[in-house]
Amino acid sequence: MKRILSFLGLILSLFLLLSACGQTTDTDGLPNKIIIKVQEFGEIYAELYPEEAPITVANFKKLVNEQYYDGLTFHRIIKNFMIQGGKGTKVDSIKGEFSANGIQNDLKHLRGTLSMARATDYNSASAQFFICQRAYAYGDGYYAAFGKVTSGMEVVDRIASVETDSSDAPLTPVIIESITFVYGA
């Protein structure tokens, strides 16, 4: 009997240890870490923060899981500000998760922050997102920050340096090959 209890204790300990080392996920079972692969530029690694922006993260993860972003572009680029991507077919809008819209979100728009783009309507965000190349204090409280680049800011900087037209569209398309989840990291 002692051997059985010892064995069960060992199994339980191993299970708890392995659980603690695993990738952080939401209740959806999908990881909160992603890779944005940008054709001819490289990879941007980011972590998503569902504790701060659960609706936004769930929406973004749903679109990533559906491969919505694959083949789209960073269609709006403003050097020393941000790169914006995800303009595609219309998807449903979500509630904006920021203080001006009555929702607490303490994430700041610092260099590397991922945030949702939107129109003037606070609840008009859907699929378009931007990555801050520089801190953007005005975004705090007015745009739904939901993640942060953990590696690959040099890629963001290279993208932010491409030549653009008068409406901030790149002269040569900057293509998002894919956005995928990082499993087991």
Where are these regions (language model features)?
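Cyclophilin-like peptidyl-prolyl cis-trans isomerases
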Residues: L5-G9, S13-A185
